[in-house]
Design a protein with these regions (language model features):
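Low-complexity, intrinsically disordered segments enriched in Ser/Thr together with acidic residues
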Residues: 1, 30, 95-148
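Hydrophobic beta-strand positions in extracellular immunoglobulin-like domains
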Residues: 16, 32-34, 136, 154
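A general secondary-structure signal for short beta-strands and their flanking turns/coil
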Residues: 7-9, 23-27, 41-43, 112, ...
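Short beta-strand elements of extracellular/lumenal beta-sandwich folds
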Residues: 18-50
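Short, compositionally biased P/S/T/A/G/V-rich stretches that sit at domain boundaries
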Residues: 11-17
Length: 186
């Protein structure tokens, strides 16, 4: 009989644009989402925390390598409770979820602050297959050189302990400046 050591680990990588102008669409790309443990994890999730400087518009779920059903939930700045955006999604399919404020029925001063994919129990080796994306727009009125920091994390429980990983992405907002040239007499 051979006793295998338990190895736990999870990963996520988030990328996006280095620069953006106010009002410009932004696409965040998520990769390397996986349970790299050699054991199953409970309450497995991956989450994106959206900064105040962006407005969520659309989510492309990606697909995953183990047959499960999962849900996508979100929080807003006016509620600490999760609301369900989509439920009973199949990990073998890619879904495009409309998440514009009007579609979600948000108040004028309300915005999505967090989106979370909730999978439950995943086996060792659970991983994304097709890439998930989150689309947002830089809010208008942002100052030149404003920094937008977006944080994604992934995690799961093993024997009551959270196994987690974090990825951050920085986008600098720049505003267009109009330069008036002097008129010449010619």
């Amino acid at each position: 009989m051979q006793n295998t050591s338990v190895s736990t680990g999870v990963s996520i990588k988030k990328t996006g644009p280095v620069q953006a102008v106010p009002g410009q669409p932004i696409r965040y790309v998520f990769s390397q989402i996986k349970n790299s443990s050699n054991v199953a994890l409970d309450s497995f999730y991956w989450r994106d925390q959206l900064p105040a400087q962006v407005t969520l518009s659309k989510i492309v779920t990606g697909s995953y390598n183990q047959p499960l059903s999962y849900k996508v939930v979100y929080k807003t700045n006016l509620s600490g409770d999760y609301r369900t955006l989509a439920d009973n999604l199949s990990t073998s399919k890619v879904y495009v979820l409309d998440a514009r404020p009007a579609v979600l029925g948000l108040a004028a001063n309300e915005r999505v602050t967090e989106v979370m994919f909730v999978f439950g129990n995943v086996k060792a080796g659970f991983a994304q297959v097709e890439t998930p994306y989150i689309y947002a727009a830089a809010r208008s009125g942002l100052a030149n050189n404003a920094s937008v920091v977006n944080v994604a994390d992934v995690g799961g429980l093993f024997n009551g302990q959270w196994i987690q990983a974090v990825s951050r992405w920085l986008t600098t907002v720049y505003t267009k400046t109009t330069v008036r040239l002097p008129k010449t007499g010619y």
